């Protein structure tokens, strides 16, 4: 069943290019990843939204996701509230509309 993961970030001022560049090759060898988009939410805020074949594919890609995060972690500000530098969620599609 199709699943998505979404991760919210706050990028340090002046680090936007490095943050975006770090994602250029994501998914090249990540089985089950269908599509990824990064959206700008304003004032240094970004979300990556990734479509996957299944929750199992997301779980299998976690080591690569962590490795990628470690490559750009220095570009991120703490989100506060004990969340650290990422605010991730994932789950199977509950409803889909055109």
Segments from the language model and where they lie:
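Short, surface-exposed ligand-recognition loops at beta-strand->loop->(often short) alpha-helix junctions
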Residues: 8-21
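A short, structured loop/turn motif at beta-sheet edges
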Residues: 12-14, 56, 98
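An amphipathic, aromatic/His-enriched active-site/gating alpha helix that lines ligand/cofactor pockets
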Residues: 24-35, 51-87
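Residues in flexible loops and secondary-structure boundaries
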Residues: 17-19, 27, 41-47, 60, ...
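Glycine-rich beta-strand-turn "strand-cap" elements at beta-sheet edges
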Residues: 1-3, 10, 35-47, 71-98
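Conserved N-terminal glycine/acidic-rich loop preference
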Residues: 4-5, 19, 46-55
């Amino acid at each position: 069943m199709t699943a998505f993961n979404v991760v919210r970030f706050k990028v340090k001022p002046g680090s936007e290019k490095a943050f975006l560049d770090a994602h250029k090759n994501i998914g090249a060898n990540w089985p089950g990843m269908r599509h990824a988009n990064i959206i700008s939410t304003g004032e240094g805020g970004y979300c990556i939204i990734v479509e996957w074949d299944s929750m199992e594919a997301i779980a299998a890609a976690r080591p690569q996701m962590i490795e990628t995060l470690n490559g750009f972690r220095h570009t991120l500000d703490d989100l506060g509230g004990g969340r650290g530098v990422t605010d991730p969620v994932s789950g199977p599609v509950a409803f889909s509309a055109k």
